[in-house]
């Protein structure tokens, strides 16, 4: 096989896109190429992403590092400051959750749970109109994500991670959860700011 053929093979169908049970939320699974040096995969390609998911203008990449039991969320930004996110884990393992806050959606109030890890290399796309959070399942996790809107502290909001109406089955004893004081003040789902 010549170099051109090899490159065409590598760049063809290098990401699997699967829409979840909630419309607009997608799981992306890359095709990973392993050899004696390690591995290579294409983490994001604008043209392929837009062909499957649609046009999203990502403007910033963020990264966080957390230890086992850390639960961040459930976060969102209100109104025109709402954010779409493409999230992934580059070290460790997390359980990632997106909650549908779109009142007009047939899945309003429902949630999606996806395990993201350095091993499965999956990504989760969460459109605007959702609350988002994750729980660290490994001793340590490095979590990175793209966003399509600026961080706007005056417009940020959160919902309690253990809200009974949402009913997320986090695989951890509540006493082992590590969260921020701000997240402890999250609203009940019924009092959240919803999207149309």
Residue ranges of each PLM-predicted region?
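Non-catalytic, conserved peripheral segments adjacent to functional cores
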Residues: 7-119, 138-140, 147-196
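Ligand-binding loop in jelly-roll beta-barrel domains
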Residues: 128-144
